[in-house]
């Protein structure tokens, strides 16, 4: 067995003596395979005491477990089994819904939420309810134990009376027998309780995994638009599976307490009346008054939880958006704006959390104090009625009242958990009730055509759920009266302006829109590739093969066709290189080519490509088009949406769409010969821009060995050894630093000080109260009247209630402060982390920290700490009280407490590591669900949906193993600790009986009543301490983000104020001196000694092949990495001495992929509110945003797999959808389900750059995915607004920059190969620029003509 993991050396006080080292042992079988959990095959003894876990715990004490050796769950507990049961019951219940749905009933048991609840119950019916029966037996055994307490006290009374009367005392064996019987009764209850909770907790595990599996399966059947319609965006689904499903899991563990506790209370009422007669009714009358208030509190807690969920969802959505758009956030220095938004939502969430914590404190105080106050009232009434306080009756009744604390404490928790579970079921019910869509057009292999559409109308509708109180807004788009016949083997191209419906048309062919009328059928299965490439976490090979059969010949052919062979040769592990979430470590062109390779890897008779070549430069585009399009198999039908005019002449037929209708269709020659035709107008207007590219495509073949030059800079990947970081795993005990950090976050000077004072008041009253009752019964102070006894006893009871209320309330503030501080520190640290952190960390992992782990801090860990401190106080009080009466108990309890501690120490390493493994295996579930939903259209089109669903089940089964074993280990500990508790009862019982000649019956009653009441507290204390250490994993993970995530250089520096006053940079001159730059530590430099001077007001174009360092130059300029040597000067100021906030705000940046954030258009343009509306409207007019309809391009959503519109229909057409309302500054924008097309997003990106009015303007391939018309319009806007400003442009179309640039900088292998005017560089024979122009088909005359056009425009 590998010993790669080992605990740090243990301190002597953390070691369990007399244990041999088991680190060399393994849980694997002789063949090295994982075993099925031995629970089912265990002997009755091992099953009863959970001893089948002994090997697991023994090894876990010696060394950390690893996931690959843990027991597997049996096939009967597989996720597929219970997911199938759940789905079957849901469908069965849906079929039995009566006509009208039962809406007239007061309780509609056929509502979606009730159906889901009943289906959950039916899925685990026998296992769950046998656990309930066991819990009932345990509760009855516990609540009837005072009968034996009374019998023992009677025995003491009889012994005392007979001894005084000189009569023979009862046989001591009789007393010992009753003490043993009391212990056995409690022991039987312990065993039933442990197994009852085991079944309840594991039922939660089974239902949790079944819910996640079923929810993922159902939502994966929806398109992004359909999910938006049902309010099931990706962030909300992640919230559901991380929070709501976990609450149902938690509710299962405590559900049975909601009814068994009531039975306990009723039995207690009967027994108390039997002891105290009618006087008991006064105590229970007080309970009848106070306990219902708990129900109101629980209801209000439920309401508060419900109110907080929208804020939680909004916070998680804001975090997800910030992470997804982190490059935009960085280059615009928007961290503080996003932090402010997230903090506002968190504060709203915390206000409700504070109210919940204080209400919970009142509830806890009531639950614990009501029995005490009821006992006070009952005993005072009993005495006031003239009854003599009989020790047997009084102390058995006191035991009953004190035992009521457990059900009364448990009831609020149980009802709260049930309320949370009910709330979660209501939130989940909508997803489970949504009708499953029927995706895909019918396929008929017998038809002649590849695609046949006749008189069809297709549409989608998106509902806006942003404001649940208002009427839901619906946006829609339609393609009407479509009649399209695509022949088999045909190259069919689709063109059109913005809002024309090109992407919607492709989406309809893969079943992502709704066919309203008409007829549509496919002749074969279709493979689809969107324009915005989607990749999954994994290796490049995994992304291309995508779970399909391995075919090396086909694979190599696909790599060659997509020009990936040269790229793979530069990667450290070739095609086994891990590329990260959505291929974040690849350039844009590389991502697109990998996605295209995946689409064509398995030959398909019908290919649907949505403008997939726009992100490629001319060279690579030419070769890929040649091999993928022009040299495709003769029988392959290719439908291509394109903005590249030079490709149109290769089409067999072209379809021109406009405003959702087919405007014209025919061959290239036919459409060019049509006077006044749409396509002829566009081609004649913009053909000159693509002439060079057209010539290049005609050439067909490229020179051998020419590396790809598509957009983006892949240099950061060439030396990468591990692109995605594995999630950190903590080993060993939770450090003192972790506990100290958590305590410091809770403002301990205030909270802990007052907590200790209130705990002393509470515990003092708890110890003195039974002693005073004893003295009252014995008449210890003859001078005191009965009324005085009553008054003091009542005062002690009230002091307990006040002390407990203060203690719980103050600790509620501690939880509130710590939750507030930990979240604030973690999110600040993450947002200010360098971009390399996000390149190597899956976003799903980060969002999991801020969902599941924050939920644990808000609702679990603090409460666990409070309960631990309370139990410690109770244990100390119990030991003190019983030792006053029975000094020998101190010696016995010392031995047993040592056993308690050693048992806990033996258990904790295994429990801690299992919980950590559970957390580590849980993150991949969220990551897989998130990235799969983002790419669901691609997954479905490739027929990989079932593989994706199977992977999710595999992840769930993997996580269920440590989770189930963790629960089982808790029961292993509970059995042993609670049996030790019964040993304490037995010891006290035997000592009391054995000391009958030296103690009074009242003293014996105090000792017995107290030990029976608190015996479980001893075990609970150890168990709670272990549970806290297990749950501290959430604190560890968030503190890691708070303190250990690397941070960017300071965003603010002392000299920034002076630069602001000087309005730096006024000119925009840039100078780079010997700059060496790397994207992150451990990588080879991407820039190697760069020297470059950019005069103020100069327009410079960066060109070069892939990996040459173009994008890296821009990253260095805005501080998106580490400059390890050299300096960058802007207007004579070293940028390393400037705060990143000022630096990035003073450089206007327009990235290739335009991103938006949820909020208003005003928020997207100016999140800090630095500009007035007049300025914002001015830039909106300049870029054309003010004339855009708010819904004009929602149709482009169908082409994206990422719940955001694709960069498809990028041009802006004000005429489209003129009936819609125009964009205003207050128009709401949704990042995930935006109504904006990619073109509109690009214009927003341009507007937010222009509003800065910066002297330096940077465009990083900003027009790569735009059509000719929008590109032309954008260039005109830039020329008009950027005169006199320093402009740096990266462009993959060389002809688009040679005419407009004053200087050309040619990058090669991280160095400046050439820099000068276009004509000067072209004149250098053998130079890099001359070579690039030659490869692009550009000659000297082309450069002259391009410059002439720019100057004259």
Swiss-Prot record:
Multidrug resistance protein; part of the gene cluster 14 that mediates the biosynthesis of a ferrichrome A-like siderophors which may contribute to organismal virulence. PANTHER family: ATP-BINDING CASSETTE SUB-FAMILY C, MULTIDRUG RESISTANCE-ASSOCIATED PROTEIN LETHAL(2)03659. GO terms for cellular component: plasma membrane. SUPFAM superfamilies: ABC transporter transmembrane region (SSF90123), P-loop containing nucleoside triphosphate hydrolases (SSF52540). This is ABC-type transporter MYCGRDRAFT_41235. Residues 1191-1200 have a biased composition (Polar residues). Residues 460-684, 1070-1334 form the ABC transporter domain. ATP binds at residues 496-503, 1104-1111. Keywords: ATP-binding, Cell membrane, Glycoprotein, Membrane, Nucleotide-binding, Transmembrane, Transmembrane helix, Transport. It is found in: Cell membrane. Glycans are attached at residues 121, 481. The chain crosses the membrane at residues 40-60, 124-144, 172-192, 250-270, 271-291, 364-384, 397-417, 748-768, 796-816, 864-882, 888-907, 973-993, 1002-1022. It holds the Pfam family ABC_membrane.
């Amino acid at each position: 067995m590998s010993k790669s993991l080992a605990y740090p050396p243990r301190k002597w006080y953390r070691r369990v003596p007399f244990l041999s080292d088991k680190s060399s042992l393994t849980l694997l079988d002789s063949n090295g395979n994982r075993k099925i959990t031995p629970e089912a095959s265990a002997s009755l003894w091992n099953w009863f005491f959970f001893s089948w876990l002994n090997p697991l715990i023994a090894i876990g004490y010696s060394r950390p477990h690893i996931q690959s050796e843990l027991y597997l769950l049996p096939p009967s507990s597989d996720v597929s089994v219970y997911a199938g049961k759940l789905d079957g019951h849901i469908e069965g219940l849906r079929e039995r819904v009566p006509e009208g749905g039962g809406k007239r009933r007061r309780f509609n048991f056929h509502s979606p939420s009730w159906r889901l609840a009943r289906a959950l119950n039916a899925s685990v019916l026998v296992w769950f309810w046998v656990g309930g029966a066991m819990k009932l037996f345990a509760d009855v055994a516990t609540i009837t134990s005072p009968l034996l307490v009374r019998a023992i006290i009677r025995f003491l009374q009889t012994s005392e009376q007979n001894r005084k009367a000189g009569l023979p005392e009862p046989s001591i064996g009789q007393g010992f027998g009753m003490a043993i019987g009391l212990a056995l009764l409690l022991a039987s209850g312990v065993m039933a309780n442990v197994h009852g909770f085991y079944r309840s907790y594991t039922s939660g595990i089974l239902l949790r995994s079944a819910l996640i599996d079923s929810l993922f399966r159902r939502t994966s059947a929806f398109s992004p638009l359909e999910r938006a319609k049902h309010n099931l965006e990706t962030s909300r689904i992640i919230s559901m599976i991380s929070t709501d499903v976990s609450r149902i899991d938690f509710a299962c563990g405590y559900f049975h307490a909601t009814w068994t506790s009531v039975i306990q209370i009723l039995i207690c009422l009967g027994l108390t009346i039997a002891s105290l007669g009618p006087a008991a009714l006064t105590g229970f009358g007080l309970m009848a008054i106070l306990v219902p208030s708990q129900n109101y509190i629980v209801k209000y807690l439920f309401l508060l939880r419900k109110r907080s969920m929208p804020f939680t969802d909004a916070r998680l959505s804001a975090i997800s958006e910030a992470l997804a758009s982190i490059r935009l956030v960085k280059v615009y220095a928007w961290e503080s704006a996003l932090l402010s938004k997230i903090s506002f939502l968190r504060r709203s969430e915390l206000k409700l959390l504070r109210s919940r914590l204080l209400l919970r404190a009142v509830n806890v105080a009531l639950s614990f104090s009501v029995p005490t106050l009821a006992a006070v009232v009952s005993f005072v009434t009993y005495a006031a009625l003239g009854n003599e306080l009989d020790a047997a009756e009084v102390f058995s009744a006191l035991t009953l009242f004190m035992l009521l604390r457990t059900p009364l404490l448990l009831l609020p928790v149980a009802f709260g958990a049930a309320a949370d579970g009910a709330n979660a079921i209501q939130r989940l019910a909508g997803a489970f009730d949504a009708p499953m869509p029927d995706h895909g057009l019918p396929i008929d292999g017998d038809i002649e055509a590849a695609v046949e559409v006749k008189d069809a109308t297709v549409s989608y509708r998106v509902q806006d759920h942003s404001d649940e109180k208002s009427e839901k807004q619906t946006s829609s788009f339609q393609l009407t009266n479509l009649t399209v016949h695509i022949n088999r083997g045909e190259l069919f191209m689709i063109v059109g302006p913005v809002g024309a419906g090109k992407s919607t048309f492709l989406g309809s062919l893969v079943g992502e829109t709704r066919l309203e009328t008409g007829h549509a059928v496919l002749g074969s299965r279709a493979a689809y590739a969107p324009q915005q490439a989607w990749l999954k976490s994994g290796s490049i090979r995994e992304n291309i093969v995508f779970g399909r059969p391995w075919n090396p010949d086909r694979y190599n052919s696909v790599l060659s066709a997509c020009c990936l062979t040269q790229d793979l040769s530069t990667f450290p592990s070739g095609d086994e290189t891990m590329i990260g979430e959505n291929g974040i470590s690849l350039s844009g062109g590389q991502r697109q080519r990998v996605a295209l390779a995946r689409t064509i890897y398995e030959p398909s008779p019908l290919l649907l490509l949505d403008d997939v070549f726009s992100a490629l430069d001319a060279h690579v585009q030419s070769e890929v088009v040649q091999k993928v399009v022009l040299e495709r198999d003769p029988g392959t039908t290719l439908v291509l949406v394109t903005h590249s005019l030079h490709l149109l002449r290769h089409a067999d037929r072209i379809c021109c769409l406009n405003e959702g209708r087919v405007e014209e269709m025919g061959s290239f020659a036919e459409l060019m010969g049509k006077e006044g035709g749409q396509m002829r107008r566009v081609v004649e207007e913009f053909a000159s821009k693509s002439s060079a590219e057209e010539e290049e495509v005609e050439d067909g073949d490229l020179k051998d060995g020419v590396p790809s030059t598509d957009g983006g800079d892949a240099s950061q990947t060439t030396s990468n050894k591990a692109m995605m970081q594995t999630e950190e795993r903590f080993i060993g005990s939770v450090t003192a630093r972790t506990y100290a950090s958590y305590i410091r976050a809770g403002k301990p000077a205030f909270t802990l000080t007052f907590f200790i004072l209130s705990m002393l008041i509470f515990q003092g009253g708890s110890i003195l109260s039974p002693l005073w009752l004893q003295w009252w019964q014995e008449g210890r102070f003859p001078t005191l009247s009965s009324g005085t006894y009553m008054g003091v006893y009542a005062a002690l009871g009230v002091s307990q209630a006040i002390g407990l209320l203060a203690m719980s309330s103050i600790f509620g503030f501690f939880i509130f402060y710590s939750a507030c501080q930990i979240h604030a520190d973690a999110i600040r640290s993450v947002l200010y982390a360098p971009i390399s952190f996000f390149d190597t960390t899956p976003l799903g992992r980060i969002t999991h920290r801020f969902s599941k782990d924050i939920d644990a801090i808000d609702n679990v860990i603090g409460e666990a700490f409070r309960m631990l401190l309370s139990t410690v106080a109770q244990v100390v009080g119990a030991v003190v009280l019983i030792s006053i009466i029975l000094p020998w108990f101190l010696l016995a309890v010392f031995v047993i407490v040592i056993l308690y501690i050693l048992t806990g120490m033996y258990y904790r390493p295994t429990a801690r590591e299992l919980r950590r493994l559970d957390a580590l295996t849980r993150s991949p579930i969220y990551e897989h669900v998130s990235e799969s939903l983002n790419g669901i259209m691609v997954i479905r089109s490739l027929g990989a949906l079932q593989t994706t669903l199977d992977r999710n089940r595999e992840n769930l089964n993997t996580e269920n193993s440590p989770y189930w074993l963790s629960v089982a280990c808790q029961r292993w500990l509970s059995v042993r600790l609670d049996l030790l508790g019964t040993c304490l009862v037995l010891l006290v019982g035997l000592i009391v009986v054995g000391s009958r000649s030296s103690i009074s019956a009242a003293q014996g009653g105090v000792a017995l009543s107290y030990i029976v009441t608190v015996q479980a507290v001893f075990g609970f204390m150890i168990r709670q301490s272990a549970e806290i250490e297990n749950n501290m994993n959430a604190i560890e993970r968030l503190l890691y983000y708070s303190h250990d995530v690397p941070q960017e250089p300071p965003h603010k520096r002392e000299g920034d104020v002076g630069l602001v006053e000087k309005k730096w940079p006024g000119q925009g001159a840039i100078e780079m001196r010997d700059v060496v730059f790397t994207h992150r530590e451990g990588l080879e430099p991407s820039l190697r000694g760069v020297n470059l001077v950019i005069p103020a007001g100069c327009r410079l174009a960066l060109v070069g092949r892939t990996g040459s360092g173009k994008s890296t130059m821009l990253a260095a300029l805005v501080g998106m990495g580490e400059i390890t040597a050299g300096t960058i000067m802007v207007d004579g100021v070293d940028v390393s001495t400037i705060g990143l906030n000022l630096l990035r705000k003073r450089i206007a940046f327009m990235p290739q992929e335009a991103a938006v954030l949820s909020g208003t258009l005003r928020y997207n343009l100016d999140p800090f509110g630095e500009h007035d509306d007049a300025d914002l409207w001015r830039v909106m007019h300049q870029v054309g945003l003010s004339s855009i309809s708010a819904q004009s391009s929602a149709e482009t959503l169908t082409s994206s797999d990422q719940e955001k519109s694709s960069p498809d229909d990028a041009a802006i057409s004000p005429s489209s959808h003129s009936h819609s309302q125009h964009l205003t500054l207050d128009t709401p924008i949704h990042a995930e389900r935006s109504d904006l097309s990619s073109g509109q997003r690009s214009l927003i990106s341009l507007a937010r750059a222009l509003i800065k009015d910066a002297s330096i303007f940077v465009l990083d391939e900003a027009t790569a995915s735009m059509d000719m018309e929008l590109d032309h319009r954008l260039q005109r806007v830039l020329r008009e607004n950027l005169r006199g400003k320093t402009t740096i442009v990266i462009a993959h179309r060389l002809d688009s920059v040679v005419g407009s640039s004053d200087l050309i900088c040619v990058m090669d292998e991280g160095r400046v190969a050439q820099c000068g005017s276009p004509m000067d560089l072209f004149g250098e024979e053998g130079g890099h620029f001359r070579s690039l122009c030659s490869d692009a088909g550009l000659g000297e005359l082309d450069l002259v003509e391009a410059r002439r056009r720019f100057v004259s425009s």
